[in-house]
């Protein structure tokens, strides 16, 4: 019996920017609540410790992402740039709820690409 193939998990620059934006947002709330950044720090811990091994072993674990070009101008531009890549690589947009945050990722036959993150109460990805 052979071991299932584990796909490489690649964090895109957009994903890193989304995490930075979440950290900045929660850091800006510290004056309201001293523990404001704990959720974002927990997300970083989960991303670094659990997310990559989980998606490498089970890349289809997330639900199909419901992306809409009506969400916002930045989302629309991003989806328009992504469309040609999706057609060639046969990428599947999926999302996984990790703690309080949705992780947007794309699965291809050869890799998993972490694309963005948002709090579960946010309407669109960063």
Task: Go through the PLM ranges and name each one.
Residues 2-4, 84-126:
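Enriched for short, Lys/Arg-rich terminal
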């Amino acid at each position: 019996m052979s071991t299932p193939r584990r796909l490489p998990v690649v964090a895109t620059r957009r994903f890193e920017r989304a995490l930075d934006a979440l950290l900045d947002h929660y850091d800006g709330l510290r004056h309201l609540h001293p523990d404001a950044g704990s959720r974002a720090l927990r997300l970083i811990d989960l991303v670094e410790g659990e997310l990559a091994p989980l998606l490498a072993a089970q890349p289809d674990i997330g639900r199909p992402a419901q992306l809409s070009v009506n969400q916002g101008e930045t989302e629309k531009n991003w989806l328009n740039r992504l469309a040609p890549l999706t057609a060639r690589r046969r990428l599947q947009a999926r999302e996984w709820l990790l703690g309080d945050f949705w992780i947007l990722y794309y699965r291809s036959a050869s890799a998993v690409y972490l694309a963005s993150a948002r709090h579960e109460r946010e309407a669109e990805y960063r």
